[in-house]
Amino acid sequence: MAEAPHIPVLLGPLLRAVAPVEGTWVDGTFGAGGYARGLLEQGADRVIGIDRDPAVFRMAEAWAGEYGDRLRLVEGTFSDLDSLAGGPVDGVVLDLGVSSMQLDQPERGFSFLRDGPLDMRMGGDGPTAAELLNTAPEQVIADVLYLYGEERASRRIAKAIVAARPLSRTGQLSDIVSACLPRPKPGQSHPSTRAFQAIRIWVNDEFGQLVAGLAAAERALRPGGKLAVVSFHSLEDRIVKRFMQARSNSAGGGSRYAPEAAREEPAFTLPFRRAIGPDEAELATNPRARSALLRVGIRTEAPAGRVDPAALGLPLLSERRA
């Protein structure tokens, strides 16, 4: 039997939260296939694995055949999951952000710890990080760093990036960012963490994809179907939280985030009052899980509605990609 893929964060809590697992599920961020395999082992009749990165399907060839036609792999973005699934589904799983697999490949340009080409694209299309940073106005770069990375030194870093252009390597970008920030104290994250996160989100339109993907999941799920979303930082989780509050009418009367949704029949119920995080055992074996949060919604019989990105707190640039 082929070696199993790595176990993704919060797999156990996710499978328990959506039990019983049955019918057809969509793994909208297939990656190394850990969630898809977990769903299949727990009783899903079929899993449709979607990913925008064609490399993940080549890696899955070593083990995917074990499941025969129970596993179907589709290249695409989870923002189109309702059309890619080809019909109603019983569950949707989304694991947001960059995968450890992508971080471990310097040639993909995601890591500030290993020098590589300044790419950061999850798929093979669209402009690279280098192309965007080398052509965008300084103000747009500053907005990206501040809105997508919550980087307080955004203006200083943007000015340094423009002064150093053209950029072509991740190491070059990391050195520029680090030179603009104080040396980190023991236990603090790398100085480039927030900037690399922000630029990656920009390159891949991750927040736009997230809002569209949540809406697509609402359209795709049968009544009683389950939506499970794992996020890794506060900006992602805020969007997911507000979506679920808005679509379940649980934000409270008069919420400024969902004034229209509160007048609609709820599209989801929320089985858990709070997000689910990792336990001590998982943290001991997988430090990457420390910031992970799982939110779950259960689809009602209400028709799918319109999702207003502004109502979800989606950070909006004044100028898209320059």
Curated annotation (Swiss-Prot):
InterPro entries xref list: RsmH, SAM-dep_MeTrfase_MraW_recog, SAM-dependent_MTases_sf
EC number: 2.1.1.199
GO molecular function terms attached to this record: rRNA (cytosine-N4-)-methyltransferase activity
Gene3D superfamilies the record matches: Putative methyltransferase TM0872, insert domain (1.10.150.170), Vaccinia Virus protein VP39 (3.40.50.150)
Subcellular location: Cytoplasm
Enzyme class: transferase
Subcellular location, principal: cytoplasm
Keywords of the record: Cytoplasm, Methyltransferase, rRNA processing, S-adenosyl-L-methionine, Transferase
GO terms (BP aspect): rRNA base methylation
A Pfam family it matches: Methyltransf_5
Residues reported in the UniProt entry to bind S-adenosyl-L-methionine: 33-35, 51, 78, 95, 102
Protein family: Belongs to the methyltransferase superfamily. RsmH family.
Protein name: Ribosomal RNA small subunit methyltransferase H
Species of the source: Paracoccus denitrificans (strain Pd 1222)
Lineage: Bacteria, Pseudomonadati, Pseudomonadota, Alphaproteobacteria, Rhodobacterales
